[in-house]
Amino acid sequence: MSEFTVYPAIDIRNGKCVRLIQGDYEKETIYGHSPLEMASRFAEEGASWIHLVDLDGAREGKKVNGGHVISIADKLDVKVQVGGGIRTEKDVYDYLSQGVERVILGSSAVSNTEFVKKMLKAYGGHIAIGLDARDGFVSTEGWLETSSVRAEELGRELANEGAEVFIFTDIATDGMLSGPNINSTVELARATGKQVIASGGVSSLADLEALASRASEGVSGAIVGKALYTNQFTVAEALERVAAK
C-alpha cells in the first residue's frame, strides 16, 4: 500500500492561529491557542507532520512569523513544512538550517521560476511546490492574483527540474468544508508523475478515506485545517481512518 500522510494545518497571522475562507483576509476566524500550543496538541494526537502557513508572509512577500515556525520545529518531535512569504535563498536556508523539514514555494513558482529551479537543485526533496489553483489556473500572492498558467503545465515543467512533492489547493474548496477536489489532485499527480498532497475542502473522515484510496495514483497526503478546528474529527481519528485503508 502507498503511504498516505495527514498534515494538520496551522495558519499564522499576527502571531495567532487563524483560518480564512477561500484565502479571504476579511473572512478570518481566530482560535485561542498559540501556534505552538496547537502544534503540541496535534503532535500529542499522533501527527508526524505539521503544515504551517505564514499568512502575513504570503501577503507581504517576506517572512513575518518565522519565529513561531522555528519554535515549533525546535520544540516538538514532528516534521514541519512551511509556506508563505519565502522569496529568497536566505529564507529557504534559514528555515531548513533551523529544523524545518520542507519549505513550500508557491507564488515564486510562477513569478520567479528560475529561483525555484535553483532551489530544487540545491535542496531537492526539502522543497515542495505549492500550486494553488482557481478554475485550473495557478493563483499567486496569497491568492490575490490569478495567473494565465495552468497548474498541470507548471507542475510538469517543475517535475522535470527535480520537484518531488507538490501541494495542490483548489481555492474554491478551501475553508468551505465542501469536500476536496479529488479529480484535479489526481490529474496533477498523473501529469507530474510525482507525489501530490491535497489541500482544501476536507470536511469528514470519508473525504480523507477517499483521498487515501488514491494513494497508489500519487495522492500522498492531505492537509486538514478547518475540519479539525470545528471538531468534525480529531487528528487521532484521521490517522486511524487512513491507516485502515
From Swiss-Prot:
Q: Name the GO cellular-component terms.
A: cytoplasm
Q: Which InterPro entries match?
A: Aldolase_TIM, His_biosynth, HisA_bact_arch, Isoase_HisA-like, Isoase_HisA-like_bact, RibuloseP-bd_barrel
Per its record, the protein catalyses: 1-(5-phospho-beta-D-ribosyl)-5-[(5-phospho-beta-D-ribosylamino)methylideneamino]imidazole-4-carboxamide = 5-[(5-phospho-1-deoxy-D-ribulos-1-ylimino)methylamino]-1-(5-phospho-beta-D-ribosyl)imidazole-4-carboxamide
Q: Hey, which pathway is this one from? A: Amino-acid biosynthesis; L-histidine biosynthesis; L-histidine from 5-phospho-alpha-D-ribose 1-diphosphate: step 4/9
Report keywords, A-Z.
Amino-acid biosynthesis, Cytoplasm, Histidine biosynthesis, Isomerase
What's the EC number here?
Answer: 5.3.1.16
Where is the catalytic site? D11, D132
**Span of the secretion signal?**
none
Q: Which domain of life is it from?
A: Bacteria
**Chief location:** cytoplasm
Family recorded in the similarity comment: Belongs to the HisA/HisF family.
Q: Which PANTHER family match?
A: 1-(5-PHOSPHORIBOSYL)-5-[(5-PHOSPHORIBOSYLAMINO)METHYLIDENEAMINO] IMIDAZOLE-4-CARBOXAMIDE ISOMERASE
Provide the protein name. Answer: 1-(5-phosphoribosyl)-5-[(5-phosphoribosylamino)methylideneamino] imidazole-4-carboxamide isomerase
Organism expressing this protein natively: Bacillus licheniformis (strain ATCC 14580 / DSM 13 / JCM 2505 / CCUG 7422 / NBRC 12200 / NCIMB 9375 / NCTC 10341 / NRRL NRS-1264 / Gibson 46)
Q: Which gene encodes it?
A: hisA
